[in-house]
From Swiss-Prot:
Disulfide bonds: none
Species: Beijerinckia indica subsp. indica (strain ATCC 9039 / DSM 1715 / NCIMB 8712)
Pfam families: KdpC (PF02669)
Transmembrane segments: 7-27
Classification of source organism: Bacteria, Pseudomonadati, Pseudomonadota, Alphaproteobacteria, Hyphomicrobiales
Protein name per its UniProtKB record: Potassium-transporting ATPase KdpC subunit
Described function: Part of the high-affinity ATP-driven potassium transport (or Kdp) system, which catalyzes the hydrolysis of ATP coupled with the electrogenic transport of potassium into the cytoplasm. This subunit acts as a catalytic chaperone that increases the ATP-binding affinity of the ATP-hydrolyzing subunit KdpB by the formation of a transient KdpB/KdpC/ATP ternary complex.
UniProt keyword annotations, A-Z: ATP-binding, Cell inner membrane, Cell membrane, Ion transport, Membrane, Nucleotide-binding, Potassium, Potassium transport, Transmembrane, Transmembrane helix, Transport
Family: Belongs to the KdpC family.
Amino acid sequence: MLQHIRPAFISLILFTLLFGLIYPLTVTGIAQFVFPDQASGSLIFQGDQVVGSRLIGQAFHRPEYLHPRPSIAGDGYDASASSGSNLGPLNPDLVKQVTERAAAIRVENQDQEAVIPADAVTASGSGLDPEISPAYAGLQAKRVASARAMPVVEVERIVAENTQPAFLGFIGQPRVNVLAVNLALDARFPIQRPPMP
């Protein structure tokens, strides 16, 4: 019996060291060397302070900022509560949420005739999307410009500068990073209140 336990124990120790220590450290080391920004979380800095990540959404509620997609990840894009809504397309609760969100967006942006993009009223699979569609960003441009007392064309220019095309030109859709736009707005057209919520 002991002759079977010894090889099993040695295998356990060997594979634990190999796959629990050596492999992760090797992959992390290679990633830090080849892709240092991405391996560190694609963090965005203002001076020496981290203000967010290009990969994780943040909640913005003030009128002078672009607003992200709705999130069901806790209160205010809580990464520890990341999950989808799990509501099917015919679920009455989803229909009610979408209807209420669309009405709120029309009021907030003072446009009762606005065509509301799907990403403006539906949560993503993770609930932490950092990006919105150019259509949703465009819908918010007038509100942001008015709140900052700046020309709408300047908001549209900042949105265009922060719009990424579809991957390889055909995979996915163009997208706008909300945090990048909001930081650019603060840099070019500062407001008198403390930055960021």
